[in-house]
Amino acid sequence: MMLRQIVSILLLCCCPPLVAQEQEWQVDSLPADSSVIKPDSQQVYEVLLRMLDRWNAHDIDGYLEVYLKSPELLVVVDSEQFNGWQQLHDSYINGYPDRVAMGFIQPKRIQVKLLKPDLALALTWWSVSFPSSKQEMMGNSTMNLQKFDDGWKIVASHTSVGGM
């Protein structure tokens, strides 16, 4: 009887880490073990890096290439909601007549998790600095990306912006 209790306790102690391992992010820009990166997760990570690169180049059209060009796209930035790619595009074009005002984004951390073979969840933490001031804006974004014939595209996202 005592042996059975010891075995039960050992099993309970060993099982939670196995469950936790399956729920880990496949890509984390601060990885504990980079050898576990999966190809699709890496593709999503690279899409996000390309998006940030285009922002820093002040290339709005290039930045928006990673979003699904569809009226079904949903983007929420704080309390402002954009329905469809065209509305998002127009908002960026009109909101940044001086592209330098976009500032420069620096990713702090990017995590990617495949939910299905063609669906991924990404979390990013970032800061934006502005050349005209010494202020820095910080925030985070949650994005759902779907795999299409032409690659991974953001189909929904939510961004929260912190103080400056």
Predicted region positions:
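Hydrophobic pocket/interface hotspot
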Residues: 51, 63-64, 72-73, 88, ...
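A short gly/proline-enriched turn/hairpin at secondary-structure junctions
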Residues: 72-83, 97-100
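A mature extracytoplasmic/lumenal domain signature
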Residues: 68, 79, 111, 124-126, ...
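Sec-dependent N-terminal signal peptides
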Residues: 5-14
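Short, low-complexity N-terminal intrinsically disordered segments enriched in polar/charged residues
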Residues: 21-66
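Sec/Tat signal peptide C-region and signal peptidase I cleavage site
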Residues: 16-20
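Short beta-strand edge/turn micro-motifs at domain boundaries
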Residues: 21-29, 138-164
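Surface-exposed, charged secondary-structure patches
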Residues: 87-131
